[in-house]
Amino acid sequence: MTEAYRTNPALRICVDRLHQGAIEGRVFSSRLTAPLVFTDWSNLVLRLERIFDQQKLPQAFQGARTFLYDVHGMENIASGDTAAGMSMELVRAQYGQLSTFDMVVVTRRYSSWQGWVDWLDGSVRQPFTGVLELLHIMEEKVRSLE
């Protein structure tokens, strides 16, 4: 396993199911020790935000402000030690039943995310400049498969 992969910020998003309008699936990454299961897009974003905060990657440009610390709700699958994360082979072998794509969040500015989505079906890479744009891109793609 190369060090370049271990520090790879890509998240493999596997969309498995569309159930009563909600998208369900799993996330795999060398930055996780176990799959992250999500029940809809907002659940995915909130859980990933917690992991980004824990790992401080990508670094938020402003400190998070909170009045309540929820220690019990923190994700326990985020790998602080890159050697403890999932292997490249395991991550690359994962595919969703409906759709699969790799998402890279490069920065977290203006209380949002910036990065791109790489579709594994050969579609053109799509950049995003905020979480709402990302949600629209993902939703549009998955709905087009129905």
Q: For the regions a protein language model found, what residue spans apply to each?
A:
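Mixed-charge, glycine-accented linear interaction segment located at domain edges/termini
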Residues: 32-36, 45-53, 114-146
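Intrinsic disorder/low-complexity detector
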Residues: 1-13, 19-21, 46-111, 141-146
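Short aromatic-glycine-(Arg/Gly/Cys) micro-motifs in beta-strand/loop hairpins
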Residues: 16-32, 106-122
